[in-house]
Amino acid sequence: TTSSAAAPETEPPEPADSPSAAPSSSGPKYSGKSKAPAGEFRAADIYGPAQNVPKPTNPPGYTEPTLDGMMKSMKAWTQWRNYGMQTGDYTEAYKFVSKNLVEEINAYNADAKLYHDGGWIIGGEQRSYDFRNDPVHQGNGVYSWDFFVGWSYIITVGADGRHKRSRNTNYADNLYTLTVHYEETGWIIDSITRKQTQK
């Protein structure tokens, strides 16, 4: 979702590297060591994936062929992308992305496979997207828009309990530009490019 790009102040404890300390591979896995009550969101941790992740709702007018419709679509995309990171379900996020944007689609596919195989991602709920300035019309119905991705860490946990932690050590590297155009079904992202930082 669009929100402050400040890094979270705390992180979950580092999962133990010893396989014996990893959560058991048998039976269901629950964050917080137990099944959350219906409707209670519980973030992912070393014990299991996120539970009861709120499902985003697309805002009215997000498919309209207007600048306002485009901006609503891009913000909806960030919400569905975060939802996918926490659940492995990128069904809606795919709809905002061109089939030619292979790197983005491959990222969705990899996350979906991780969840399908019994793994999960820790830290997905803390990722934020801050769109900067106004979108720029590049001609022929194509717009570009700068955005900042705020995150401090991501941990992927395999079904066997083995984990991999990625840390964000350079926030200046998190500026991107996307380009988007309109089709009959709505606004579609054509490219996502990391902006070169000035030195």
Specify the residue positions occupied by each region the protein language model found:
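Exposed beta-sheet edge and beta->alpha loop/turn motif
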Residues: 1-11, 16, 21-23, 28, ...
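Juxtamembrane and targeting peptides
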Residues: 1-69
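Intrinsically disordered, low-complexity segments enriched in small/polar residues
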Residues: 25, 30, 37, 46, ...
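Polar low-complexity intrinsically disordered regions enriched in Ser/Thr and small residues
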Residues: 35, 42, 121-122, 126-127, ...
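Core segments of small alpha/beta cavity-forming domains
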Residues: 45-122
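N-terminal short leaders/motifs
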Residues: 80-88, 129-145
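A mature extracytoplasmic/lumenal domain signature
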Residues: 97-100, 108-109, 126-127, 148-151, ...
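A short, amphipathic edge element
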Residues: 116-134
